[in-house]
Amino acid sequence: MLKPRIIPTLLVQHGGLVKTIKFSNQRYIGDPLNAVRIFNEKEADELTVLDISASREGKAPDYRLIERLANECRMPLSYGGGIKNLEQASRILSFGVEKIIVSSLAIENPKVISSMATYLGNQSVVVAIDFKKTLLTRRYEVFIHNGTKKTGISPEDLLKHAIEFGAGEILLNSIDRDGVMEGYDLEMLKKFRSICTVPMTVLGGAGSLQDLKSLIQNLGIVGVSAGSLFVYKGIHKAVLINYPNREDKEALFY
């Protein structure tokens, strides 16, 4: 059995590296290219880059930035943000990006996902599901365009439909836990895991390596992703790019 991948997630806004709390309160923390270089040195398993400004503002992907990131990156790279069609996805993969990540597309134009899976291979297509608990119903609901638009769709339903349309991987992203570093919602994630028939990666909530270990041991998933955990250090959240060394990473699996 393959060991789960430990995946840093970097958020990009207008070309700069930022961090958010519950998809808001953007804080500029540096240059994404510099962060990639550091994760190269630390031999990260994989890297995810999400352009939140492209997602929120409906802009096309920043191809120049993506190409520079791909050229710099020495590990498998996934990219999401602003991808609306097969041509854009194909161009991004041509830079050396391993997987493209789409979110809003799964609701607004899911047939494009089927085309991507057919022509690019479903292993290259990840559907990200951004969800949070609504104040009125206290039920989980999917939000799109970087959390700015309600859909009325449950994450469970979207997960099933995304797989039907050809997604080769699901990225579950908790808006409520984004940047708060208080752990994952294990009970909710277990429900997702029970109905997910493709590889599943989880993002949102990690505040310690123990949180990663709990997720791996409880869910048996292929990928554990985190943002704040790998860019902050200490209770005052000083910016310091970090990643577990080989010994600490091995301890997560046993």
From Swiss-Prot:
<dbReference type="InterPro" id="IPR011060">
    <property type="entry name" value="RibuloseP-bd_barrel"/>
</dbReference>
<keyword id="KW-0456">Lyase</keyword>
<protein>
    <recommendedName>
        <fullName>Putative imidazole glycerol phosphate synthase subunit HisF</fullName>
        <ecNumber>4.3.2.10</ecNumber>
    </recommendedName>
</protein>
<dbReference type="InterPro" id="IPR013785">
    <property type="entry name" value="Aldolase_TIM"/>
</dbReference>
<dbReference type="GO" id="GO:0000105">
    <property type="term" value="P:L-histidine biosynthetic process"/>
</dbReference>
<keyword id="KW-0963">Cytoplasm</keyword>
<keyword id="KW-0368">Histidine biosynthesis</keyword>
<comment type="similarity">
    <text>Belongs to the HisA/HisF family.</text>
</comment>
<comment type="pathway">
    <text>Amino-acid biosynthesis; L-histidine biosynthesis; L-histidine from 5-phospho-alpha-D-ribose 1-diphosphate: step 5/9.</text>
</comment>
<dbReference type="GO" id="GO:0000107">
    <property type="term" value="F:imidazoleglycerol-phosphate synthase activity"/>
</dbReference>
<comment type="function">
    <text>IGPS catalyzes the conversion of PRFAR and glutamine to IGP, AICAR and glutamate. The HisF subunit catalyzes the cyclization activity that produces IGP and AICAR from PRFAR using the ammonia provided by the HisH subunit.</text>
</comment>
<dbReference type="InterPro" id="IPR050064">
    <property type="entry name" value="IGPS_HisA/HisF"/>
</dbReference>
<keyword id="KW-0028">Amino-acid biosynthesis</keyword>
<dbReference type="GO" id="GO:0005737">
    <property type="term" value="C:cytoplasm"/>
</dbReference>
<dbReference type="InterPro" id="IPR006062">
    <property type="entry name" value="His_biosynth"/>
</dbReference>
<dbReference type="InterPro" id="IPR004651">
    <property type="entry name" value="HisF"/>
</dbReference>
<dbReference type="GO" id="GO:0016829">
    <property type="term" value="F:lyase activity"/>
</dbReference>
<feature type="active site">
    <location>
        <position position="130"/>
    </location>
</feature>
<dbReference type="Pfam" id="PF00977">
    <property type="entry name" value="His_biosynth"/>
</dbReference>
<comment type="subunit">
    <text>Heterodimer of HisH and HisF.</text>
</comment>
